[in-house]
């Protein structure tokens, strides 16, 4: 699991991701990539998608993420040079090597989100909709 330091997860997010990974990998007979965030910016364009049933959430096929995602060792090894290029070359956007991987591998995100990217609310990424993020923030207090 690759996670950036500005994400807050629902308490059961990891359970949801692991059960969903197992379920959908079995369904498609292949490895995949899960992003825990339903980014609002991905709804700017209309495009066809596929919807999958996870443990407790529906998940939809997406073609872009930031740098927080869950995948398998097999996917990392298969696309190692693309992952490595993120550290050795300047890409714009930074995540473009990931987007290239998603042309070959299934990448999905939950509807609604199970994690929030704590970015500026006015940024292109925005806050994932249909969640009480204040409640989730409070539940994550240490």
State where each predicted segment sits.
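Conserved catalytic core of nucleotide-sugar-dependent glycosyltransferases
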Residues: 1, 8-82
């Amino acid at each position: 699991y690759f996670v950036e330091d500005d994400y807050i997860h629902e308490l059961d997010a990891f359970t949801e991701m692991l059960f969903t990974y197992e379920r959908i990998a079995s369904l498609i007979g292949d490895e995949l990539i899960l992003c825990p965030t339903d980014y609002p910016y991905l709804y700017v364009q209309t495009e066809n998608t596929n919807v999958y049933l996870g443990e407790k959430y529906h998940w939809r096929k997406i073609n872009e993420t930031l740098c927080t995602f869950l995948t398998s060792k097999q996917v990392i090894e298969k696309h190692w040079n693309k992952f490595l290029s993120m550290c050795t070359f300047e890409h714009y956007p930074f995540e473009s090597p990931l987007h290239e991987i998603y042309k070959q591998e299934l990448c999905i995100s939950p509807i609604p989100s199970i994690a929030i990217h704590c970015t500026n609310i006015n940024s292109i990424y925005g806050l994932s909709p249909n969640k009480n993020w204040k409640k989730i923030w409070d539940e994550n207090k240490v």
